[in-house]
């Protein structure tokens, strides 16, 4: 993969109506993320970091501006096409995991592959390999309720990586992890950004993690500022 932009936004803004008032959460944001680049976004609670991730990932629509993922303008796509593009090009790690409770760890990780019609044996092989890489080779057949918070987070990270997307977005990825496991996740991001040119966009309060990224941006008063 070349160092082209895997994600970009121009003049991005988001506002919400609260009664007769309109509250501007984000305003005039511009961002470009290239293949293999790792970018951290920091900011105080309530600054709009998760809102920004949802806009960049096509989970919400901006009030102003546009987002391009893998060269496709998200607002120009219908819901189905947008969903297929996200599944193919984007991995997303939510702060609270969003694992399917009735499925095992390996079944959860297989899900993006099965949606993309990967044969079941290949899907299971790739899912198992990733779960082993995040230290869960012994927990393949456990359901989310049988896993700790940190283990569920690692399953979510494996699920985000299994489709080999060009971009992975992570919302507080190390919040429930001990130092050793968090360092392992950071090393995995470093390895994938170098070897596979996977780009990572990380929202975090963990300044140690942020400092290990290629760039750090602060979301302040609705604007992104390089720090």
From Swiss-Prot:
Keyword annotations for this protein, in alphabetical order, are:
ATP-binding, Cell inner membrane, Cell membrane, Membrane, Nucleotide-binding, Translocase, Transport
Mention one GO molecular function.
transmembrane transporter activity
Q: Which residues bind ATP?
A: 43-50
Compartment(s): Cell inner membrane
Q: Sorted alphabetically, which InterPro entries does this protein's record hold?
A: AAA+_ATPase, ABC_transporter-like_ATP-bd, ABC_transporter-like_CS, ABC_transpr_LolD-like, LolD_lipo_ATP-bd, MacB-like_ATP-bd, P-loop_NTPase
* Enzyme Commission number(s): 7.6.2.-
Write out the GO biological process terms.
lipoprotein localization to outer membrane; protein localization to outer membrane
Chief localization: membrane
Enzyme category, top tier:
translocase
Specify the ABC transporter domain's residue ranges. Answer: 7-227
Q: How does it sit in the membrane?
A: Peripheral membrane protein
One GO CC term on file: plasma membrane
> Which PROSITE patterns does this entry report, sorted A to Z?
ABC_TRANSPORTER_1 (PS00211), ABC_TRANSPORTER_2 (PS50893), LOLD (PS51244)
Self-association or partners: how does it assemble? The complex is composed of two ATP-binding proteins (LolD) and two transmembrane proteins (LolC and LolE).
What does the record give as the function of this protein? Part of the ABC transporter complex LolCDE involved in the translocation of mature outer membrane-directed lipoproteins, from the inner membrane to the periplasmic chaperone, LolA. Responsible for the formation of the LolA-lipoprotein complex in an ATP-dependent manner.
Q: Which family does it belong to?
A: Belongs to the ABC transporter superfamily. Lipoprotein translocase (TC 3.A.1.125) family.
* PANTHER family noted in UniProt: IMPORT ATP-BINDING PROTEIN, LIPOPROTEIN-RELEASING SYSTEM ATP-BINDING PROTEIN LOLD
What is this protein called in UniProt? Lipoprotein-releasing system ATP-binding protein LolD
